[in-house]
């Protein structure tokens, strides 16, 4: 068809050009032009023809039987559509439309049609400007002139193009409109719309306009089923309209989840050639079915997952297996242990000085808990199994630990005092117990390893800051302690003007990568016991698994513990119920089911212990307050470990009466409750490491500690509230004399606080000095050794629940004991500590 049309088409175009015929003179003058070219511009000599085509791109020169000739034929059909001029080339025109076409074609011929005139630009003229490119046309150059545009208008041969399509005007045929030249197609479109379906000019009164184009009303139909789409919904695909049904059947995608069509009205998600319904049920994790809409996802083998755990087929909520639970916690513990060991030598001397000046009983907070261990703890609680004795928290065979000559003052405390210690308000060191009584108490306490769970809650045991024998000797677990566990013991602390080195170890710890918070002791704040039996309802487990999530969310790590503690209230402890899951194994092994422990104590709560310990000094030691110790570069009142006696001539690393003895550096052991020992007994600080597997074997030895109850019921005398009030008046008066500019540290704090808030008047005073002396929250979350009393990496907890005890009941229960001479505690701490304890309920039953 292409080979037949050129001659006919050329005749048609000649008629359109007002019966324009090639001039015979032009053909004769061109010489061999007709033989070489398919078409030559009329009126040119052969050399001018060659000059003209030399200006055009080679691929557009219409040589005979060349690509240029084919291009010319194609452009004739495209630029001069026959159906724009002849009715016979149109389809399905009614009579009115045929008349319209004739009128339209004749009007265009009369007013717009023309052919360009090619001739050399006269040499006598100075030159002209090309209408298209603006370039100069010099004399003698070949130029194209358009009579309809005017005599002075000319173009370079390659610039004689359609204004719309920028294509060379085939055979120089143009249509002039409003100062611009067009090809026949685009000129007709300037006057009438063209149907996108039949490519004919639309002469009807109505048409459909869609996608920026026009259609005859009957022609705008589905490309597949030819359903008229005028006023209907349609979908364009590759420039063709489709009805919704045909499009869904031909092009709709299938959902990879439900294998159903994704309708045109349904949203869809697409990734790497895959498609899903944009719904929570389809675009979700392939393992846990969690919706991934608006969330990142992990593609793997044609499926999408919400996490790496799901992509590996693991349980995203955690596994029952102790091997797979909290692997990240174990990794953090191993890194923490390596860091502590690496900085051991660097911080040993600095921590020695720090510990000799400040020995505050507090416990380390851990953010690492094995869920299975928590479950085993709760099982142990509910079954009221025998408690476990704690293994030594720190102990070094190479570095002995000795106590001073004040150990005999640490053994007796009244229940009021103990409860007040739980309230972090006051504490005191009663005297009156001889040094010889302490070894006997040790023998009674540890001669029989069997202690029941109730004994762990209400028996006699270590004092509030007492170091039990297990703390320093290997092979056994430490006894569990609750709020009532401390009734027979107490602590003492000496204050004096002792030249102790500055706290440079804090800076070394910061530089060495070990936070001071990594040195938090592990003994619980609530290490108190009662001797009376609890009712079954009072022995229900009180752990809380939701505190595990809370503790992990708070970021209590070795690096972040200090920041968290700085945010705590100055006069209140954090919600101790949140700590029940932090290190349940360590905590419950010391205090049964009581969740509040020193592990969750903030820096302010530690300071409140310090303020509490100030009550231990009597008037004889009060004059020492005038000689403050050095804390860093500040002159403040330092504090000595309760078991140490210093004099100015002895180095801070030595103990009185012990040659070559120095204190275990704080990088290897935590600040703990000090216990009274005889002067000649040597203890080795050491932080033991327990393996989780070895702990699990000792879940079977829960009934090994029962006989201590009878042996530990010999308690030192206790004091009553009247002595405490009297001492408080004397103490406050003497403090006002000795420290006139100091605010009252022992003023009673309001009771109208949260049952978990512990009033602390000491925090404001000691805040500037102990802000950087916070305790480690993460350094020993999972110690490793082969000692007993652990199951799957965590100690077996013991149940307990305390109840409110009236003053009469306390006097009745402890009437056999006298109140120590320096008792400074009243009944205020009792109800407050019970309220603290009462608010800790276990959410796992």
Swiss-Prot record:
Domain PET: 18-126
Keyword set, alphabetical order: LIM domain, Lipoprotein, Membrane, Metal-binding, Methylation, Nucleus, Phosphoprotein, Prenylation, Repeat, Zinc
Residues carrying Phosphoserine: 92, 319, 321-322, 544, 547, 608, 643, 732
Propiece span(s): 843-845
LIM zinc-binding domain sequence ranges: 128-193, 193-253, 253-317
GO terms classed as biological process: blastocyst formation; embryonic brain development; establishment of cell polarity; establishment or maintenance of epithelial cell apical/basal polarity; maintenance of postsynaptic density structure; neuron projection development; regulation of postsynaptic density assembly; response to electrical stimulus
Distribution of this protein across tissues and organs: Expressed in the hippocampus and cerebral cortex.
Subcellular location as annotated: Nucleus membrane
Alphabetical list of InterPro entries matching this protein: LIM1_prickle, LIM2_prickle, LIM3_prickle, PET_domain, PET_prickle, Pk/Esn/Tes, Znf_LIM
Keyword Chloroplast appears in the UniProt entry: no
A single GO cellular-component term on record: nucleus
Region (Disordered): 314-346, 483-546, 558-581, 642-700, 823-845
Record family assignment: Belongs to the prickle / espinas / testin family.
Listed name of the protein: Prickle-like protein 2
């Amino acid at each position: 068809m292409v080979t037949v049309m050129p001659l006919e088409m050329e005749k048609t175009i000649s008629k359109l050009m007002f019966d324009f015929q090639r001039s015979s003179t032009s053909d004769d003058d061109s010489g061999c032009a007709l033989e070489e070219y398919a078409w030559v511009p009329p009126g040119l000599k052969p050399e001018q023809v060659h000059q003209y085509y030399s200006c055009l791109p080679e691929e557009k020169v219409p040589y005979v039987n060349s690509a240029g000739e084919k291009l010319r034929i194609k452009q004739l059909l495209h630029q001069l559509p026959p159906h724009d001029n002849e009715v016979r080339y149109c389809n399905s025109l009614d009579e009115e439309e045929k008349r319209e076409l004739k009128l339209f074609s004749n009007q265009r011929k009369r007013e717009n049609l023309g052919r360009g005139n090619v001739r050399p630009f006269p040499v006598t003229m100075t030159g002209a400007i090309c209408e298209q490119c603006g370039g100069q046309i010099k004399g003698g150059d070949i130029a194209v002139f358009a009579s309809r545009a005017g005599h002075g208008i000319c173009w370079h041969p390659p610039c004689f193009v359609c204004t719309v399509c920028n294509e060379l005007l085939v055979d120089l045929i143009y249509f002039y409109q409003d100062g611009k030249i067009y090809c026949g197609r685009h000129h007709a479109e300037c006057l009438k719309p063209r149907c996108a379906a039949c490519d004919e000019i639309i002469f009807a009164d109505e048409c459909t306009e869609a996608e920026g184009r026009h259609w005859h009303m009957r022609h705008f139909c589905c490309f597949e089923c030819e359903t008229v789409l005028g006023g209907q919904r349609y979908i364009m695909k590759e420039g063709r309209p489709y009805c919704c049904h045909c499009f869904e059947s031909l092009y709709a995608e299938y959902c990879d989840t439900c294998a159903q069509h994704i309708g045109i009205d349904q949203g869809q998600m697409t990734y790497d050639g895959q498609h899903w319904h944009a719904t929570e049920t389809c675009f979700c994790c392939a393992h846990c079915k969690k919706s991934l809409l608006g969330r990142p996802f992990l593609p793997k083998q044609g499926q999408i997952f919400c996490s790496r755990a799901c992509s590996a087929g693991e349980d995203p909520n955690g596994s029952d297996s102790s091997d797979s639970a909290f692997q990240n916690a174990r990794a953090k513990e191993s890194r923490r242990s390596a860091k502590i060991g690496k900085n051991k030598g660097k911080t040993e001397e600095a921590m020695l000085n720090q510990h000799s000046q400040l020995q505050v009983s507090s416990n380390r907070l851990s953010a690492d808990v094995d869920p299975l261990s928590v479950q085993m703890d709760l099982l142990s609680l509910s079954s009221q199994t025998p408690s476990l004795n704690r293994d030594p928290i720190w102990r070094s065979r190479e570095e002995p630990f000795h106590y001073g000559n004040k150990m005999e003052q640490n053994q007796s405390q009244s229940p009021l005092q103990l409860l007040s210690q739980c309230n972090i308000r006051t504490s005191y060191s009663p005297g009156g117990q001889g040094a010889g009584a302490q070894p006997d108490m040790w023998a009674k306490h540890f001669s029989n390893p069997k202690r029941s769970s109730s004994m762990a809650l209400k028996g006699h045991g270590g004092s509030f800051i007492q170091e039990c024998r297990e703390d320093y000797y290997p092979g056994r677990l430490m006894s569990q302690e609750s709020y009532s566990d401390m009734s027979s013991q107490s602590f003492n602390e000496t204050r004096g003007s002792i030249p102790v080195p500055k706290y440079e170890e804090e800076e070394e710890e910061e530089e060495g990568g070990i936070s001071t918070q990594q040195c938090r002791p592990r003994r619980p704040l609530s290490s108190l016991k009662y001797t009376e039996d609890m009712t079954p309802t009072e022995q229900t487990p009180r752990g809380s698994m939701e505190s595990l999530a809370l503790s992990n969310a708070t970021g209590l790590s070795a690096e972040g513990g200090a920041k968290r503690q700085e945010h705590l209230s100055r006069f209140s402890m954090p919600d101790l119920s949140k700590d029940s899951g932090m290190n349940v194994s360590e905590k419950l092994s010391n205090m049964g089911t009581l969740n509040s422990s020193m592990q969750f104590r903030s820096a302010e709560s530690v300071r409140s212990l310090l303020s509490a310990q100030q009550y231990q000094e009597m008037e004889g030691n009060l004059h020492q307050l005038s000689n403050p110790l050095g804390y860093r570069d500040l002159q403040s009142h330092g504090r000595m470990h309760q078991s140490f006696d210093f004099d100015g001539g002895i180095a801070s690393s030595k103990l009185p009466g012990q040659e070559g003895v120095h204190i275990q550096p704080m990088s290897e052991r935590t600040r703990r409750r000090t216990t009274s020992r005889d002067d000649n007994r040597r203890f080795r600080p050491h932080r033991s490491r327990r393996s989780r597997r070895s702990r699990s074997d000792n879940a079977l030895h829960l009934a090994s500690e029962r006989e201590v109850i009878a042996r530990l019921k010999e308690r030192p005398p206790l004091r009553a509230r009247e002595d405490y009030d009297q001492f408080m008046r004397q103490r406050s008066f003497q403090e006002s004399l000795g420290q006139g500019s100091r605010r009252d540290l022992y003023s009673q704090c309001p009771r109208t606080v949260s049952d978990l808030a512990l009033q602390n008047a000491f925090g404001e005073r000691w805040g500037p000095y102990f802000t950087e002396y916070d305790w480690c929250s993460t350094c020993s979350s999972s110690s490793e050794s082969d000692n007993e009393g652990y199951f799957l990496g965590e100690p077996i907890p013991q149940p307990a629940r305390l109840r409110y005890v009236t003053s009469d009941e306390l006097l009745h229960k402890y009437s056999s004991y006298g109140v120590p001479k320096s008792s400074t505690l009243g009944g205020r701490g009792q109800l407050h500590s019970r309220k603290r304890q009462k608010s800790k309920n276990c959410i796992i039953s």
